[in-house]
């Protein structure tokens, strides 16, 4: 039996239903599962001395585009809004292949892990003609090499520019091709068991790049296969105009008409829902992945998170792709979310601790998982720890629950543990030679961008 003990943590912030915070306590994991939290001494061979540390549940990222890690900070797109931004970047993304996917995934997930992330959902929807094979497989290989909990998606686009959509022909597929590979991906990789390290959702890209038929058939197939549904929705006013002009409906009304609503569905962004639509999301348990930094960079708007939380809409936190973020740091996202809503909503804004819960138990809920997101006996041993005995955090531990929102910590964290195994130690990835990986990735970026 593999056992790991976090010993003598100054605080353990559990994010459990009672908002419990343990002080001067130990946390024991056995075969990847938490079996004890409390002050009593525990004996085991592998021990992390957590003296001075605050231990938190592992952060859960609910929307990403890992392939975009190799197209960040490009000067030609820095001042564009979504539609023009996408049109410019499709000309780069059409050159994706499995090698780029693997190394960009290692780079992006490695950054996330160094900053306390333990579960990542990735929305991969670009499958270039002639290079579509093996892309999702490369992501799972990268996740396995890093030792991370991976929730991938088989994304898709079939509505090209010639058919009235946004993407060029070079990055779209037929409905039949897409549905066949969706089924293959689920049958090959989706593990629905408790503490699963590999899961798959179906995730057509957006209403402006996917046909009505593909959206409808994807919803039917996902429910036949018992997997979840995800897409972008209500991200910009341009999208709203597109759907109104093409379909005669608002975006949520259109998606609901195709079966895209319910507790097995979550949308990325969700900025431009009206009040009635927010109530509909709450009634149906439909979730939203909040991506504040991306929304700010692309001038998309501010998601109505305070109202969502008040109504009971499930909300998770996400970094979005590195071409619109331009990074993979969920700790930074957490603090930005806190500050953005303080600016926008004052006393109605979520507290620093509320935002931590959005990034943990909230994110777990919209991914349909009750085995991760909080530190409780019987849940997965996914956590991270920050040593507060440093100049930057003097006095910050007076409110450990809110620290990550109010004071903030950009990382790297001192420890990240996934499934009861240490994946980051003293701020360094355990399963990766970071310097070598960075050199290889940098060389590949230059090659990829010159294609």
Task: Identify what each model region corresponds to.
Residues 257-264, 306-390, 406-408:
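His/Asp/Glu-enriched, well-ordered alpha-helical/loop segment
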Residues 1-43, 53-54:
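N-terminal metal-binding scaffold of metallo-dependent hydrolase/deaminase domains
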Residues 15, 380-438:
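C-terminal cap of metal-dependent C-N hydrolases
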Residues 130-270:
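Metal-coordinating catalytic core of metallo-dependent amide/deamination hydrolases
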Residues 28, 72-149, 180-194, 442-450:
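Alpha-helical scaffold segments that flank or form the walls of functional sites
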Residues 12-24, 37, 298-299, 305, ...:
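Acidic, glycine-enriched loop/beta-strand segments at the rims
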Residues 70-101, 159-175, 196, 237-264, ...:
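Active-site gating loops and adjacent loop-to-helix segments of metal-dependent hydrolytic enzymes
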């Amino acid at each position: 039996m593999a056992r790991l003990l976090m010993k003598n943590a100054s605080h353990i912030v559990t994010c459990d239903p009672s908002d419990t915070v343990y002080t001067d306590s130990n946390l024991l994991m056995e075969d990847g599962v938490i079996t004890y939290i409390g002050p009593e001494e525990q004996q085991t061979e592998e021990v992390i001395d957590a003296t001075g540390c605050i231990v938190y549940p592992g952060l859960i990222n609910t929307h990403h585009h890992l392939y975009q890690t190799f197209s960040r900070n490009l000067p030609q797109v820095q001042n564009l809004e979504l539609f023009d931004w996408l049109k410019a970047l499709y000309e780069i993304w059409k050159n994706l292949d499995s090698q780029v996917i693997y190394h960009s995934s290692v780079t992006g997930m490695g950054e996330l892990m160094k900053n306390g992330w333990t579960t990542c959902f990735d929305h991969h929807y670009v499958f270039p003609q002639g290079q579509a094979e093996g892309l999702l497989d490369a992501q799972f290989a990268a996740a396995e090499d890093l030792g991370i909990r991976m929730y991938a998606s088989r994304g898709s686009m079939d509505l090209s520019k010639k058919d009235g959509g946004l993407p060029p022909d070079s990055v779209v597929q037929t409905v039949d091709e897409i549905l066949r590979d969706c089924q293959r991906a689920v049958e090959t990789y989706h593990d629905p068991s408790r503490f699963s390290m590999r899961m798959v959702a179906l995730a057509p890209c957006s209403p402006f790049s996917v046909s009505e038929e593909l959206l409808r058939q994807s919803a039917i197939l996902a429910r036949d296969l018992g997997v979840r549904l995800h897409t972008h929705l209500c991200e910009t006013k341009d999208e709203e105009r597109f759907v109104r002009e093409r379909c005669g409906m608002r975006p949520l009304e259109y998606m609901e008409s195709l079966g895209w609503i319910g507790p097995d569905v979550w949308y990325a962004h969700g900025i431009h829902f009206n009040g009635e639509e927010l109530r509909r999301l709450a009634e149906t348990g439909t979730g939203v992945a909040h991506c504040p930094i991306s929304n700010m960079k692309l001038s998309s708007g501010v998601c109505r998170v305070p109202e969502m939380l008040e109504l009971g809409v499930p909300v998770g936190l996400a970094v979005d792709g590195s071409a619109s973020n331009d990074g993979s740091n969920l700790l930074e996202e957490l603090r930005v979310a806190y500050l953005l809503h303080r600016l926008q909503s004052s006393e109605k804004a979520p507290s620093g601790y509320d935002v931590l819960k959005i990034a943990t138990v909230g994110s777990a809920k919209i991914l349909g998982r009750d085995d991760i997101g909080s530190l409780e006996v019987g849940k997965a041993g996914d956590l991270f720890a920050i040593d507060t005995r440093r100049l930057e955090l003097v006095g910050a531990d007076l409110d450990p629950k809110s620290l990550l929102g109010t004071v903030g910590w950009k990382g790297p964290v001192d420890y990240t543990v996934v499934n009861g195994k240490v994946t980051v130690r003293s701020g360094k990835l355990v399963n990766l030679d970071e310097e070598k990986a960075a050199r290889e990735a940098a060389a590949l970026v230059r090659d990829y961008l010159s294609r």
